[in-house]
């Protein structure tokens, strides 16, 4: 949206065409993980041969490495081998994540957990469970096994319960007390480690296919920013991007560090689908403990909407991406108001105010509630 506003001459575009101190841009390598796994026959391979080779090379030079996997825990999914069911949170419609250090399956959205000892399938009571997927804890274990002499630290929400912990880990890595820093997106932005000459992005596709119009922007931003952590001094840096979608324009533009080309393509897609910056958005969430009552409410509200106008699109009703959280069901309506008809968003604001004013008194809602978001960051 900011790039579009620059094009419309509403704001100035200040850029840094060169890296500070004359540092060179890193050399970027793309690893096609499907081809890599087919070649090696290891279809559960997490660290590609190229990334392993580059890590060893940097360790031999006494240089540091940053590895990014934007998913914490050990295994994001635990599945029964007998019936195929996923181990799910009983309060949220979310798969439980296995945390090996705690030996627990934990929901990242509420306080629910299951101890791994004597764990049975929730559906068929089967004993055989398969722990699949990769989180930061698994990456840490694999790197420990492959490079046992290296000193490794990990930075994610599990190791950084306070700002003191975060500062302590980053300071130790900056002082070269550790060789390898493994983390989530927390380590991708705004950090300066002159001796870090390799950044490895374990799974660059995470988040790429989430049903949100800003998903590709977030993935591009993560890769672009993470690449900027490598080679920030006189030492040349390298970046290894592991992906299952090597031909994706997002991956290609990130590889070439071509931010303007990415912006231009993204704007074309946003214009075609009438998303910001070409429209104003409002998201209205309907939340309650009874799924059928929540859906009945949202259907009734949509049916009774008054004073619709030209340029207004209404999406839904539809389940939110996270349909059930903390024993509450979540549905949403999304309102898109074209800026060509509604230049300052006043039509959309007036429409929402008029149609939802009745619900300011919560009595008609009972146990349900309605949340209204103008210009939401995400539609998830």
Spans of model-derived segments:
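Short, conserved charged micro-motifs
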Residues: 291-297, 340-354
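Short amphipathic alpha-helix segments
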Residues: 259-260, 293-315
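Short proline/glycine-enriched turn/loop segments at secondary-structure junctions
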Residues: 321-324, 360-361
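Short beta-strand elements
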Residues: 153, 308-320, 364-375
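Inter-lobe coupling/hinge segments of SF2-like helicase ATPases
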Residues: 1-285, 290-295, 321, 332-333, ...
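C-terminal effector/interaction modules appended to NTPase cores
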Residues: 326-328, 364
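A common structural junction motif
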Residues: 302-311, 350-366
């Amino acid at each position: 949206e900011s790039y579009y506003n620059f094009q419309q001459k509403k704001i100035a575009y200040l850029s840094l065409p060169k890296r500070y101190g004359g540092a060179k841009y890193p050399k970027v390598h793309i690893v096609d993980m499907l081809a890599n796994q087919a070649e090696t026959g290891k279809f559960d391979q997490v660290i590609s041969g190229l990334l392993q080779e580059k890590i060893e090379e940097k360790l031999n030079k006494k240089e540091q490495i940053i590895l990014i996997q934007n998913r914490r825990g050990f295994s994001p999914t635990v599945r029964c081998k007998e019936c195929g069911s996923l181990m799910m949170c009983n309060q949220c419609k979310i798969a439980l994540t296995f945390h090996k250090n705690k030996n627990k399956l934990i929901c990242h959205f509420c306080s629910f957990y299951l101890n791994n000892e004597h764990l049975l399938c929730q559906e068929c009571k089967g004993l055989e469970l398969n722990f699949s997927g990769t989180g930061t804890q698994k990456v840490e274990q694999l790197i420990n096994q492959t490079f046992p002499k290296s000193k490794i630290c990990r930075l994610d929400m599990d190791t950084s319960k306070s700002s003191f912990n975060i500062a302590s880990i980053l300071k130790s890595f900056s002082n070269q007390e550790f060789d390898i820093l493994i983390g989530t997106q927390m380590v991708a932005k705004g950090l300066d480690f002159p001796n870090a000459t390799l950044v490895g992005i374990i799974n660059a596709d995470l988040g790429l296919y989430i049903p949100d119009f800003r998903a590709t922007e977030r993935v591009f931003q993560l890769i672009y920013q993470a690449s900027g952590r490598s080679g920030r001094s006189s030492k040349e840096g390298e970046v290894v991007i592991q992906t299952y979608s090597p031909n994706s324009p997002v991956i290609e533009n990130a590889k070439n560090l071509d931010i303007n080309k990415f912006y231009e393509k993204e704007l074309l897609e946003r214009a075609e689908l009438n998303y910001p910056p070409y429209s104003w958005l409002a998201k209205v969430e309907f939340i309650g403990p009874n799924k059928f009552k929540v859906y009945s409410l949202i259907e009734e509200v949509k049916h009774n909407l008054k004073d619709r106008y030209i340029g207004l699109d209404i999406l839904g009703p539809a389940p939110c991406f996270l349909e059930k959280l903390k024993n509450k069901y979540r549905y949403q309506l999304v309102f898109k108001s074209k800026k060509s008809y509604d230049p300052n968003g006043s039509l959309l604001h007036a429409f929402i105010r008029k149609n939802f004013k009745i619900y300011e008194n919560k009595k008609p809602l009972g146990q349900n509630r309605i949340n209204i978001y103008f210009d939401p960051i995400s539609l998830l």
